[in-house]
């Protein structure tokens, strides 16, 4: 990808942890993300980093809105890269879904970590709430405010580069601000930024252009999209048209998810099954001629390899399965018969595990898994 080479096609998806104070990286983030590098993921993404404080989903989100946040991100990128992974970050503005309790908390429930925090005024393309869990109707952004946010996306890209990230991704999915502009269900504007598809794409494309202009030419840029919004307002054909425009701006990979326009869900109300979002990645890849990243209930090596061999996507993003198994890539390699002696593991782990397998039953020796 441009001037960057990943050691493999496995990616840790951005997953919010709500453990930051003032948007700063801390020891928790180093440990949480660092273990994925030890597990040999090719690309490790941070959670979404807000481009301004009011763009945070919760007060515990990471940030990329202030130069004072760069040094903490440098600690993280140095560790990830030293262990062989590409360091990637995702930037976002939550729009009308900002100022929320953590997803595992009840609405309006704030715990000891919240320190008396109160909701702040949220914004969006129109004065329409995202649902009962979220703040009351947002303030509809005017054009000067939108231009200021576009500038903040560009400034966040500059900070991400200063922090040493190899890859940047815009979070334009799951009902956050850019997705709010795209969907006619949340964008009821009657100016140049609303109306037909071209109008609704105008603000997200401006944000993408600002990031590309402030992100080095030799570094790749991704964007996460919801291929369908879950309510019938935005569909796969819209996403393919959008991807054509993104490709023209210099976006390198479309990270293809779905849903999240309202409520908690980050996927559209479609039947959940193994790889249920892979067809979206395939449709965008073939329809727009742009590399894609597949995500969504991809659980093991053979399943992931089939997605790649079928040409449905170029990268495999692992989310919750990575939380369950931070060593997913090396386990996948063992499942595929690519590593029988733990040679793909860090030697600090692999040497010991290779010795350990000699004490295991034959049917367990290939992977070194414990007997259940």
Regions found by a protein language model. Name each.
Residues 1-372:
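Flavin-dependent oxidoreductase catalytic cores
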């Amino acid at each position: 990808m441009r001037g960057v080479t990943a050691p493999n096609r496995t990616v840790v998806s951005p997953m919010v942890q709500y453990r930051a104070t003032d948007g700063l990286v801390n020891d928790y983030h180093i440990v949480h993300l660092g273990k994925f590098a030890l597990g040999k993921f090719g690309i490790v993404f941070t959670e979404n980093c807000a481009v301004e404080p009011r763009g945070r989903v919760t007060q515990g989100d990471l940030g990329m809105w202030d130069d004072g946040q760069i040094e903490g991100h440098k600690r993280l990128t140095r560790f990830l890269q030293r262990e062989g992974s590409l360091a990637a970050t995702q930037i976002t503005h939550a729009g009308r879904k900002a100022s929320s309790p953590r997803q595992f908390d009840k609405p309006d429930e704030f715990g000891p970590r919240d320190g008396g925090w109160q909701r702040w005024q949220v914004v969006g393309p129109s004065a329409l709430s995202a649902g009962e869990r979220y703040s009351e109707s947002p303030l509809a952004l005017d054009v000067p405010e939108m231009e200021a946010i576009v500038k903040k996306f560009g400034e966040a890209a500059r900070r991400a580069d200063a922090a040493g990230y190899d890859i940047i991704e815009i979070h334009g999915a799951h009902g956050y601000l850019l997705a709010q502009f795209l969907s006619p269900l949340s964008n009821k504007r009657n100016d140049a930024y609303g109306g037909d598809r071209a109008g609704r794409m105008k603000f997200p494309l401006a944000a993408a252009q600002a990031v590309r202009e402030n992100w080095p030419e030799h570094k790749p840029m991704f964007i996460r999209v919801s291929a369908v919004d879950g309510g019938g307002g935005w569909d796969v054909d819209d996403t393919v048209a959008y991807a054509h425009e993104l490709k023209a701006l210099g976006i390198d990979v479309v990270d293809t998810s779905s849903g999240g326009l309202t409520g908690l869900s980050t996927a559209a109300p479609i039947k959940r099954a193994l790889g249920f979002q892979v067809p979206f990645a395939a449709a965008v890849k073939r329809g727009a001629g742009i590399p894609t990243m597949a995500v969504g209930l991809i659980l093991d090596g053979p399943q992931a390899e089939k997605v790649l061999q079928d040409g449905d996507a170029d990268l495999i993003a692992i989310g919750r399965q990575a939380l369950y198994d931070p060593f997913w890539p090396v386990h996948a390699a063992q499942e595929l018969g690519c590593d029988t002696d733990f040679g793909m593991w860090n030697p600090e782990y692999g040497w010991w595990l290779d010795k350990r397998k000699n004490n295991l039953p034959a049917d367990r020796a290939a992977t070194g898994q414990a007997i259940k």
